[in-house]
């Protein structure tokens, strides 16, 4: 089953980004891909919130979104908009929303990013996604030609409980469109995505933003496809482009037969915490070391 990943350096104009995506979708369809994947914030990357807000709209009034719905229907291809900012009617904050469009031009699924990127990096970069966005509340699974697909976005990948829930639901594919910073990408990107694939025995598809953006932000790139064994099938490096890869969907069954993590999975109760009074009593009565006696956790000569 052939898929196409679009690694982008999105700019501050949604319609320019949408035009780039339309060309890529058409090429993906011509190359025989059944599904096209774009990164997080595919339609807009802009740190200037006031400037960016003038482009915000709900789904029916987003010209960029409607243009992508039309091109998906024209080329009869599944389209995964990794994410885009959506201002739902009456909402004070935006949703960072992943949207899947079916080949008939209907929206098959929506997922709002659950974990918002509020961090202070050692490099000096500070991010407060929650200042403009509201986190989603619900994991989403959608049926696609690739099988059952669990949706997530970028920072979500650091929270394994979400993927445990997806694994319990029997997903075959996980999507993780992203816009990683360079420092966190160099340190964690490949490791996290391979871990999510291995623990779920599922394909992981992660289209990414890359290079230096119009607003000055730099993103890591390295869009990845990882198979259920944890092998990297595609790594797009650090420049924008479109790439296709063929997935052997039978690999899901083979891996799960070899290492049946789903069948062996147990419901884990909360751990028993140590009784602090009992622990203190043990420390208080523990006797002699080479240098003296431990009394209430302190070393005395």
Each language-model region and where it sits:
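Extreme N-terminal starter segment of soluble prokaryotic enzymes
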Residues: 1-4
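Short polar catalytic/cofactor-binding loops
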Residues: 7-13
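Short beta-strand scaffold segments in enzyme catalytic cores
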Residues: 81-83, 97-100, 140-142, 223-225, ...
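C-terminal beta-strand edge segments of enzyme domains
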Residues: 209-300
